[in-house]
Amino acid sequence: MTICQSANNPYADCAAHYVESRKLSELVLDEFCSKTGIFKQNVREMDDMTGTNWSQVPTVIVEMGFLSNVSDDRLMATEYFRQEAAIGIANGVDAYFEWLETSTVDENATGDQTATESPTETDIS
């Protein structure tokens, strides 16, 4: 599971980063689950996490498993899983930066953000 703030987060300007944080969370979750084989849960939007509430940049919190789950606990204790988890998270961050290169985040008159694809060279000429 990954966690990001909601679009309506009442703290600071973190809502300004919602679209990017949501996309980062989705990509990290996809890559993490693909690499580790962990059951994919959804991205959770929460507004009670200090780590996301006051951030000035897009954020993601990664829950790699549940210590209350014996299977997860044993799995997270292995070097192999931790290495695969790190690779999956890194792949997700790389995918996010690739997405940023091909997308722009536009702010409309209501202050909401939407992600759009950047124009290609053929669109410009």
Please annotate each region the language model reported.
Residues 1-125:
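Active-site-proximal helix/loop segments of hydrolytic enzymes
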